Amino acid sequence: MKIAAYEVRRDEQKDFAFIAEKLGVELTEAEDNLTLENIDTVNGAEGVTTLGRTRLDRALLTAVQERGVKYISTRTIGADHIDLTAAKELGLKVCNSNYAPNGVADYTVMLILLSLRKYKPALWRAQVNDYSLAGLQGRELRNLTVGIPALDHQSGKV
């Protein structure tokens, strides 16, 4: 089986090589997004994997399907960059990554608290020995209403 990987980061390359060898898969890698302009790079591949920058709309999905691709994998939690209706109509199988819900929830809460407490500007100041408090008055989470806009297993942990 041949898989074409796009948006490949340097930190992924070693793992890709290990898995490809272990499974006996031919793997082509590209740092670029998959586009209609470079669509011929999927020729001969049964599967395509991307991150979230590639917009797999109906036109791009049709083009990969016409070149023999049967499987689309996104290395992201969400799949909102993929036209899932078009993929289903074209007979393409789609999957996405599964991240530990608790880790994602912890990261989300951390970002919320960092934003509320204006941590980034405080950190910048501390790096130049400026410990003044002007403009750093944050807010407390207990005084705010927090909405969780999704209903998946990730957001349920937040």
Regions found by a protein language model. Give the residues of each.
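An N-terminal-biased, well-structured beta-alpha scaffold segment characteristic
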Residues: 2-93
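Glycine-rich adenosine-cofactor-binding loop
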Residues: 7, 139-158
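A structural signal for well-ordered alpha-helical scaffolds and beta->alpha junctions
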Residues: 9-13, 101, 105, 155
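Short secondary-structure transition/capping segments
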Residues: 14, 73-86, 120-130, 144-150
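Phosphate-binding beta-alpha-beta segment of Rossmann-like dinucleotide-binding domains, i.e.
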Residues: 90, 95-145
